[in-house]
C-alpha cells in the first residue's frame, strides 16, 4: 500500500497506565459481538465491547442517513467488557421502523462521564477530549458497531462532505454526528450459497490482482447496471478461467471511504479508489453492490464468490488490519482533535497503540495510528472478521496489507524503551513471539496443506514504515510473502544494465524460488509470491515504457501525490531515439515470462494481459477513473500480448516442473553458461556476466518434458550452446521473446513447437530477451 502522505516522524512511546488486563484468547467470536436476531426473529440482541465505558446507549433508525433516531435503549454490562441489550422486534416496529433496522451507539466514559442533563450537541459532563489513560469518549459522536455486518453509507458521501462533524476537539466536540454517521444494518442470515471452495494446492495457482469496480466499470459486454459491481465481477469468471487464472485477489472490499468519489465529476477531489481506509471489517463495501438494499451487498458478494468457485477459481481479499479510516490526531501538536467513527469512541486504548502520555498514536502505517494488534481484544476482532469472510462469505485466502504491523510485539501498558519485547520503543516485529497477531492467526485457522486440501492461503505484505518492519523472509512457516526483491532484482536486470551492478546470482535465485529468503524457515518455493508489478506502482507496460513516474498529469491519469522514486523502469530507449514500441513489448514479454516460469506462486496485475497503461503514474490510489478501469477493446498488439500471456500461463499449468513443492535438487536443476559449460563459482562471482541458462529435469519432477530457459541480459546478441536433452529427445522452441518474434504466434500452441536441435546446438539470442525450449 502507498499512502498519500507519510508522517515526517514516528512518535515515541511510553508506559500506559490504567489499562485493564486483557481477556485470554477464546473461541471465534466467543463474546457474540454484533447485532443478531434470535431463531424466531422475534428479538434482536446487540452486544458491543468497551472496557472503559461507563454508559452505552443504542440508537435505532429507520434509515441510514438524514433522520433522527426512532428509539433508544440503554445497554447493561454483561461481563468481560461486553455491553448488551435485547430488543423485541415488536417494539422496534412500534417505534415506526418497519423495514431494515439501522443502529449506532453513543458511549460515555472517564473523560466524558454521563450527566443527566446531557442532550445531543451538549457539553454536559465533559472533562476532556482525551484523558491520561487515552480515553476519547464523546456522546455527540454516533458510533458504528465494529461488528456490524453491513454499513449504511460512508461518513463522507454525496450528501455530506464535511468531515468535521466526526471530530473531537474544542471546535467540533459538540457537533452531533447522529444524522450523518454511518450506521450498522441488522441482517437476517443470508441463504445465498458461495459454492464449493477449490482445494487446489497454492503452488498450482496463478493469482490475478484486480479492483472490483475497475474490473467491469467500462466493460461494454456487461449490462450497464452491473458494471463495477460484485455481480459484474462474477460475470467475468469465464474470462479469468480462459486466461488461465486460478485465483482472483481483490483490492480491499471491506467498507471503505469511497462514497464521495463521484461528488466532483472528472476530478480526483475526495477520491479513495484503492480502498485502504477501512471503516468496518465485516461489511462488504456497499458502493460495489448492484443491490444496495439491506442484505443486498452481502448476498451479492456471496453470489460472486459462487460464480468464481463454479469456475474453479479461488477468491482472495486484500485486508487492512494495520490501521483504520479513523487515522490519528489531525496534527502532531494538538492531541485533542481526532476523527471518531467507531473504535476510537468505544475503546481508544484497546484498539489503537498509544504513545507517551497516551495522547497520541504510534504509527508504522503512514495513516496516523497503528491498530493495536498485540492486544487480545483487537486480535479477536481480526480473527472474528477473517472467520466471517472465510466461513460466511466464502473467501479462500487473504493478503494482509503492511502485515509487519501484525507482527508487532509492543502493547499499550507493556512497553518502555527497555522492555524485553520492545527494545525499539513502540514497534518491534517478533515472529518468535507466540502472542503476535500473525501467530494467533496461524493458531486459529487451518492453513492449506502444501499438497492442497481445505484451509486458507495467507499472504503477507512483509513491510511497513520504520523500525524493523521490513521483514521479507521473516514471517513464520504458514505464511507466504509478496517477494518485493523478486520484482526489484528482475526489473534491475532488464532496465538498469550499465546503471548499477547486476548480479546474475540473484536472478538465478529468483528463478528457482528464492531459497535465500524462505528455505531456512522451513518454507517452500511456493511461499514466494512472485510479481513484476502490482497495483502499488507501475503497470507491466509502464515498467518497460517509462523512465520515471509522472503523477502530476491531468485527469484521468492524475494528479496523484506520493509514489516511490525507485521504479527501476526504462522506456527501452524510446525517448532517446534508440528504441521503439516493439522493444517495449519484448521487454514486457520477458518480464511476464520471468514471472510465470519461476518457481513460486505468480501474481499478475489485472490488465497486464493486454499491456494496460497508467501513463507512468505509479501511485494511482486516488483515481476512480477510466485510467484505473480495465478495458476490453484492444489494439492488435494488445490482442497479441493477451495470446502470449494466455499461452504462457497454460504452459506453466501444463508443466509441474515449474511448480515444485520443494526446493530443486542439484540433479533436478542445472545452471549453464552461454558456452554450454556448467556455471561455476568463477562465473557466478563475475559481475560482468549478464547471461545465464538453466535446464530442469522434467521427468524427475513428474513432467513429461524437460525445460530449458536462457536469459540474455546483455544489450547485444549472445550465442547459447544447448546441453543434452533427455535421451531420445531434442530441444524444441516454445517462445523467444525477441523483436523478430513479435506478433500473434510469439508463444506457440502445444504441438507447434519448432525443432532447434540436440546437445551442442547453438542458438543466437538477441539482447535482453528470454528463450524457452522443451524436450520432446
From Swiss-Prot:
Keyword Membrane recorded: no
Marked site (Transition state stabilizer) residue numbers: 536
Cofactor(s) for this UniProt protein: Ca(2+)
GO biological process: one example: carbohydrate metabolic process
Positions annotated as active site in the UniProt record: 401, 461
GO MF entry, a single one: isoamylase activity
Enzyme class: hydrolase
One GO term describing the cellular component: extracellular region
Cysteines joined through disulfide linkages: 410-422, 546-616, 738-766
Cofactor comment: Binds 1 Ca(2+) ion per subunit.
EC numbers: 3.2.1.68
Alphabetical UniProt keywords: Calcium, Disulfide bond, Glycosidase, Hydrolase, Metal-binding, Secreted, Signal
InterPro entries per the UniProt record, alphabetical: GlgX_Isoamylase_N_E_set, Glyco_hydro_13_cat_dom, Glyco_hydro_13_N, Glyco_hydro_b, Glycoside_hydrolase_SF, Ig-like_fold, Ig_E-set, Isoamylase_C
Binding partners and assembly: Monomer.
Entry protein name: Isoamylase
Amino acid at each position: 500500500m502507498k499512502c498519500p502522505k507519510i508522517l515526517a516522524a514516528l512518535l515515541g512511546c511510553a508506559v500506559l497506565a490504567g489499562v485493564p488486563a486483557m481477556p485470554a484468547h477464546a473461541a471465534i467470536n466467543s463474546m457474540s459481538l454484533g447485532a443478531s436476531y434470535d431463531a424466531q426473529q422475534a428479538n434482536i440482541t446487540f452486544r458491543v465491547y468497551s472496557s472503559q465505558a461507563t454508559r452505552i446507549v443504542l440508537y435505532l433508525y429507520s434509515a441510514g442517513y438524514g433522520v433522527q433516531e426512532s428509539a433508544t435503549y440503554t445497554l447493561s454490562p454483561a461481563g468481560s467488557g461486553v455491553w448488551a441489550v435485547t430488543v423485541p422486534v415488536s417494539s422496534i416496529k412500534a417505534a415506526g421502523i418497519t423495514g431494515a433496522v439501522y443502529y449506532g451507539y453513543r458511549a460515555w466514559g472517564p473523560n466524558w462521564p454521563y450527566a443527566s442533563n446531557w442532550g445531543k450537541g451538549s457539553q454536559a459532563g465533559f472533562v476532556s477530549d482525551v484523558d491520561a489513560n487515552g480515553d476519547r469518549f464523546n456522546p455527540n459522536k454516533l458510533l458504528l458497531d465494529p461488528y456490524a455486518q453491513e454499513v449504511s453509507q460512508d461518513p463522507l458521501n454525496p450528501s455530506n462532505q464535511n468531515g468535521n462533524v466526526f471530530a473531537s476537539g474544542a471546535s467540533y466536540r459538540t457537533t452531533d454526528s447522529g444524522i450523518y454517521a454511518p450506521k450498522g444494518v441488522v441482517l437476517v442470515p443470508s441463504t445465498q450459497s458461495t459454492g464449493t471452495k477449490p482445494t487446489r494446492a497454492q503452488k498450482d495457482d496463478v493469482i490475478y490482482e484486480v479492483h472490483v469496480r475497475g474490473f467491469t466499470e467500462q466493460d461494454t459486454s456487461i449490462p450497464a447496471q452491473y458494471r463495477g459491481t460484485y455481480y459484474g465481477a462474477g460475470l467475468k469468471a469465464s474470462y479469468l478461467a480462459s486466461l488461465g487464472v486460478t485465483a482472483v485477489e481483490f483490492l480491499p472490499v471491506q467498507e471503505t471511504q469511497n462514497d464521495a468519489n463521484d461528488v466532483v465529476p472528472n476530478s480526483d477531489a475526495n477520491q479513495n479508489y484503492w480502498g485502504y481506509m477501512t471503516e468496518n471489517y465485516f461489511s462488504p463495501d456497499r458502493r460495489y453492490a448492484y443491490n444496495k438494499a439491506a442484505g443486498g451487498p452481502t448476498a451479492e458478494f456471496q453470489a460472486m464468490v459462487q460464480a468464481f468457485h463454479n469456475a474453479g477459481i479461488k477468491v482472495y481479499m486484500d485486508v487492512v488490519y494495520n490501521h483504520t479510516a479513523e487515522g490519528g490526531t489531525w496534527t502532531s501538536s494538538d492531541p485533542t482533535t481526532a476523527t471518531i467513527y467507531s473504535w476510537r469512541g468505544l475503546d481508544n486504548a484497546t484498539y489503537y497503540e498509544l504513545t507517551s502520555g497516551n495522547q497520541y498514536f504510534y504509527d508504522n502505517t503512514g495513516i496516523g495510528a497503528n491498530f493495536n494488534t498485540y492486544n487480545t481484544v483487537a486480535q479477536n476482532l481480526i480473527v472474528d472478521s477473517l472467520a466471517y469472510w472465510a466461513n460466511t462469505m466464502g473467501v479462500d485466502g487473504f493478503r494482509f496489507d503492511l502485515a509487519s504491523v501484525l507482527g508487532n510485539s509492543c502493547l499499550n501498558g507493556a512497553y518502555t524503551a527497555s522492555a524485553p519485547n520492545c527494545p525499539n520503543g513502540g514497534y518491534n516485529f517478533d515472529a518468535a513471539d507466540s502472542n503476535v497477531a500473525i501467530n494467533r492467526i496461524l493458531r486459529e485457522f487451518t492453513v492449506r496443506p502444501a499438497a492442497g486440501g481445505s484451509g486458507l492461503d495467507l499472504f503477507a505484505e512483509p513491510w511497513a514504515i520504520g523500525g524493523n518492519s521490513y521483514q521479507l523472509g521473516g514471517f513464520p512457516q504458514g505464511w507466504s510473502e509478496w517477494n518485493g526483491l523478486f520484482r526489484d532484482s528482475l526489473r534491475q536486470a532488464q532496465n538498469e544494465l550499465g546503471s548499477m551492478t547486476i548480479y546474475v546470482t540473484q536472478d538465478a535465485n529468483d528463478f528457482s524460488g528464492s531459497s535465500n529468503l524462505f528455505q531456512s524457515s522451513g518454507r517452500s518455493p511456493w511461499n514466494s509470491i512472485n510479481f513484476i508489478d502490482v497495483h502499488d506502482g507501475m503497470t507491466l507496460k509502464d515498467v518497460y515504457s517509462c523512465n520515471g513516474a509522472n503523477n502530476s498529469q491531468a485527469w484521468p491519469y492524475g494528479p496523484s501525490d506520493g509514489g516511490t522514486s525507485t521504479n527501476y523502469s526504462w522506456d527501452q530507449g524510446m525517448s532517446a531515439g534508440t528504441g521503439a514500441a516493439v522493444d517495449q513489448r519484448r521487454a514486457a514479454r520477458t518480464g511476464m515470462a520471468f514471472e510465470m516460469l519461476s518457481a513460486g506462486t505468480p501474481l499478475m496485475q489485472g490488465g497486464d494481459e493486454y499491456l494496460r497503461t497508467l501513463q507512468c503514474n505509479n501511485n494511482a490510489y486516488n483515481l476512480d477513473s477510466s485510467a484505473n478501469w480495465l478495458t476490453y477493446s484492444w489494439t492488435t498488439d494488445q490482442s497479441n500480448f493477451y495470446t502470449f500471456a494466455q499461452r504462457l500461463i497454460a504452459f506453466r499449468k501444463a508443466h509441474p516442473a515449474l511448480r515444485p513443492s520443494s526446493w530443486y535438487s542439484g540433479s533436478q536443476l542445472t545452471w549453464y553458461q552461454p558456452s554450454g559449460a556448467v556455471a561455476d563459482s568463477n562465473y557466478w562471482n563475475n559481475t560482468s556476466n549478464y547471461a545465464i541458462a538453466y535446464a530442469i529435469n522434467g521427468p524427475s519432477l513428474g513432467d513429461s518434458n524437460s525445460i530449458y530457459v536462457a536469459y540474455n541480459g546483455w544489450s547485444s546478441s549472445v550465442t547459447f550452446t544447448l546441453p543434452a536433452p533427455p535421451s531420445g529427445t531434442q530441444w524444441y522452441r516454445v517462445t523467444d521473446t525477441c523483436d523478430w518474434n513479435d506478433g500473434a504466434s510469439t508463444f506457440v500452441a502445444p504441438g507447434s513447437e519448432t525443432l532447434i536441435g540436440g546437445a551442442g546446438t547453438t542458438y543466437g539470442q538477441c539482447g535482453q530477451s528470454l528463450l524457452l525450449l522443451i524436450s520432446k
